[in-house]
Swiss-Prot record:
Compartments, as annotated in UniProt: Mitochondrion inner membrane
Other noteworthy facts: Heme 1 (or BL or b562) is low-potential and absorbs at about 562 nm, and heme 2 (or BH or b566) is high-potential and absorbs at about 566 nm.
Family (UniProt): Belongs to the cytochrome b family.
Membrane topology according to the record: Multi-pass membrane protein
Complexes and interactors: The main subunits of complex b-c1 are: cytochrome b, cytochrome c1 and the Rieske protein.
Chief place where the protein resides: mitochondrion
Record-linked Pfam families: Cytochrom_B_C
Record-level GO BP terms: mitochondrial electron transport, ubiquinol to cytochrome c
Gene: mt:Cyt-b
Cofactor(s) needed: heme
Protein name: Cytochrome b
Keyword Lipid biosynthesis: no
TM segment ranges: 15-35, 77-97, 109-129, 136-156
Annotated source species: Drosophila subobscura (Fruit fly)
């Protein structure tokens, strides 16, 4: 019987996962209880004047990319639709991969597109924290187009690459 020679890895990776979970919970609790305003915007703590609208209202840092997309479209309804789509795409994304291979390491062009997308989201986040003025408006519009084009181009490149491999 070959079971005698096998090493049971179940306790090891289970213990590793439990330790990792405990460390992450500890870090989260430490952040929330010790310094809850660390990632907040200092402008949120300025007492409001109800007679004056603030010059720049901005959301939390994790929605700044969507805020930049909202501001980059001049039409109000179009901006709101783009804002909702920019977040809804992220929820649909796990069901979006229809490629033959389940890793991006087999698609070199998609690797380049991934890094372009990462830079695009970082720049959109930065632009979301800037005031609404030139050149940020034009740059936000260009990056918004790149953001949505990624979701159109990425599956086409994957299918093209799958056809090349056949």
């Amino acid at each position: 019987n070959s079971n005698i020679d096998k090493i049971p890895f179940h306790p090891y990776f289970t213990f590793k996962d439990i330790v990792g979970f405990i460390v992450m919970i500890f870090l989260l609790i430490s952040l929330v209880l010790i310094n809850p305003n660390l990632l907040g915007d200092p402008d949120n703590f300025i007492p409001a004047n109800p007679l004056v609208t603030p010059a720049h209202i901005q959301p939390e840092w994790y929605f700044l990319f969507a805020y930049a997309i909202l501001r980059s479209i001049p039409n109000k309804l179009g901006g709101v639709i783009a804002l909702v789509l920019s977040i809804a795409i992220l929820m649909i994304l796990p069901f979006y991969n229809l490629s033959k291979f389940r890793g991006i390491q087999f698609y070199p062009i998609n690797q380049i597109l991934f890094w372009i997308m990462l830079v695009t989201v970082i720049l959109l986040t930065w632009i979301g924290a800037r005031p609404v003025e030139e050149p940020y408006v034009l740059l936000g519009q260009i990056l918004t187009v790149i953001y949505f084009l990624y979701y159109l181009i990425n599956p086409l490149v994957s299918k093209w690459w799958d056809n090349l491999l056949n």
